[in-house]
Amino acid sequence: MPQLNPSPWLLMALSLWVCFPLMMLSLSSFLPLTLKTSLPSTLKSSPNPWILPW
């Protein structure tokens, strides 16, 4: 039974293709919570386009 040996580039691309949406999903769900709790009120009230009003 010959063992399949995929190229490391293909393996890395596949793992990135699988993990990247999951990481973005977890970031988009966890980042606003941490921003809301950890940022001081001065930074919260400043108009920052990267902080989305969740």
Curated annotation (Swiss-Prot):
- Pfam family name, one: ATP-synt_8
Keywords of the record, alphabetical order, are: ATP synthesis, CF(0), Hydrogen ion transport, Ion transport, Membrane, Mitochondrion, Transmembrane, Transmembrane helix, Transport
Q: Output a single Gene Ontology CC term carried by this record.
A: proton-transporting ATP synthase complex
Membrane-crossing ranges are 13-35
Q: Could you state one GO biological process linked to this protein? A: proton motive force-driven ATP synthesis
Q: Which InterPro entries match?
A: ATP8_metazoa (IPR001421)
Mainly localized where?
mitochondrion
Does the entry feature the keyword Transmembrane helix, yes or no?
yes
Cellular location(s): Mitochondrion membrane
One MF term in the entry's GO annotations: proton transmembrane transporter activity
Its membrane topology is listed as: Single-pass membrane protein
Its assembly, as annotated, is: Component of the ATP synthase complex composed at least of ATP5F1A/subunit alpha, ATP5F1B/subunit beta, ATP5MC1/subunit c (homooctomer), MT-ATP6/subunit a, MT-ATP8/subunit 8, ATP5ME/subunit e, ATP5MF/subunit f, ATP5MG/subunit g, ATP5MK/subunit k, ATP5MJ/subunit j, ATP5F1C/subunit gamma, ATP5F1D/subunit delta, ATP5F1E/subunit epsilon, ATP5PF/subunit F6, ATP5PB/subunit b, ATP5PD/subunit d, ATP5PO/subunit OSCP.
Functional summary from the UniProt entry: Subunit 8, of the mitochondrial membrane ATP synthase complex (F(1)F(0) ATP synthase or Complex V) that produces ATP from ADP in the presence of a proton gradient across the membrane which is generated by electron transport complexes of the respiratory chain. ATP synthase complex consist of a soluble F(1) head domain - the catalytic core - and a membrane F(1) domain - the membrane proton channel. These two domains are linked by a central stalk rotating inside the F(1) region and a stationary peripheral stalk.
Return the similarity comment: Belongs to the ATPase protein 8 family.
Q: What is this protein called?
A: ATP synthase F(0) complex subunit 8
Q: Which gene encodes it?
A: MT-ATP8
